[in-house]
């Protein structure tokens, strides 16, 4: 296991020739701290797995350190379904650390910041949380995927802290010399009961000036971040304003790609590009100051990144959103949500978007906010 600073990680990346799995918390770069974040996760944590299972097109490949792949496969077949005995009569009380009225007031203030030129776009988050509640992380993860299956999901454990993540967003992927980033900005609620209205929502999202302005700012930031370490002239936008379908929502996703020099170190890439453009804003330094000023809690692993590094130094990392952070020791959980704020933002609609993004998690927890229809 590894935990330490980014400079320490630089040596780990250079010296390791095996798989590594782990995370970078948002705080690891913004606060420059070595201590654990408020949610209990280390700022930076990576581990070398005992076994790696790769499933592609119905073909399972098993790589192991101390056991034969055959033994691991037979152990999987013999494994019984493990679940914790949780009291199903529990009542969960979910609260927000910023209530609706205060949220609207903060968005109005952020629009003033934008109007006077402090920034152009800022990602602002609120946190829903509950205390004294026990959950089974594995069952919760399976339930979350059933409601909201997404391509960058993960169930991740660091001591007694769990990340139950159904992320739709990729931060960075490196394959050989090519690196890509795929910022998401732009969300529309789907209507699966009415195909005509569902198609209309998709069309409105694709044509929305407000959503396009959010997206293009994230794209410009990603281009700037990648240009700091990619070969000169290699950074380009291969897709702009793509509309992708998910079970709950439509998302506007763009793809920025570039060519990295030989022997590029992941620590240098993280130093240049993290935190990601879609979870900060423009200009990045100023909006990170505003985030610290207006958000009520440090983000921790939320809006950080979880991923893996292959023995060939390729890697793939997500953006930690649409996630439950659960502390099994204190029996507390939280799930922050947010969105990009621009001058065109309407505070009431921004709040509705936050609730929409939280709805899948609230659904599996069996909770409805008393003053909102989800």
Across the structure, where does each feature detected by a protein language model lie?
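Extended alpha-helical targeting/anchoring segments
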Residues: 1-374
């Amino acid at each position: 296991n590894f935990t330490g600073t980014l400079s320490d990680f630089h040596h780990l990346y250079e010296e390791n020739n095996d798989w590594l799995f782990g995370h970078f918390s948002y705080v690891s770069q913004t606060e420059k701290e070595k201590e654990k974040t408020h949610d209990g996760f280390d700022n930076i944590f990576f581990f070398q797995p005992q076994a790696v299972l790769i499933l592609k097109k119905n073909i399972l490949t098993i790589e192991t350190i101390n056991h034969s792949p055959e033994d691991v496969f037979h152990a999987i077949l013999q494994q019984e379904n493990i679940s914790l005995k949780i009291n199903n009569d529990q009542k969960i009380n979910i609260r927000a650390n910023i209530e609706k009225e205060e949220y609207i007031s903060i968005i109005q203030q952020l629009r003033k910041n934008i109007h006077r030129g402090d920034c152009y776009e800022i990602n602002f988050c609120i946190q829903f949380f509950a205390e004294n509640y026990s959950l089974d992380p594995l069952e919760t993860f399976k339930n979350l995927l059933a409601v909201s299956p997404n391509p960058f999901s993960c169930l991740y454990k660091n001591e007694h802290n769990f990340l139950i993540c159904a992320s739709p967003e990729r931060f960075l992927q490196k394959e050989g010399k090519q690196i890509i980033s795929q910022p998401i900005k732009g969300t529309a609620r789907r209507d699966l009961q009415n195909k005509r209205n569902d198609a209309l929502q998709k069309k409105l999202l694709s044509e929305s000036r407000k959503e396009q302005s959010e997206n293009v700012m994230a794209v410009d930031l990603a281009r700037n971040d990648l240009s700091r370490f990619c070969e000169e002239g290699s950074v380009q936008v291969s897709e702009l304003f793509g509309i992708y379908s998910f079970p709950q929502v439509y998302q506007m996703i763009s793809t920025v790609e570039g060519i990295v020099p030989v022997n590029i170190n992941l620590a240098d890439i993280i130093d240049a590009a993290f935190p990601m453009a879609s979870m900060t804003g423009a200009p990045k330094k100023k909006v990170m100051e505003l985030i610290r000023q207006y958000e009520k809690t440090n983000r921790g692993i939320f809006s950080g990144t979880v991923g893996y590094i292959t023995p060939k130094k390729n890697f793939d990392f997500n953006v930690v959103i649409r996630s439950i952070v659960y502390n099994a020791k204190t029996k507390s959980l939280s799930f922050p949500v947010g969105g990009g704020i621009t001058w065109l933002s309407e505070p009431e609609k921004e709040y509705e978007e936050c609730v929409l993004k939280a709805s899948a998690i609230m659904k599996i927890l069996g909770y409805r906010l008393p003053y909102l229809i989800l």
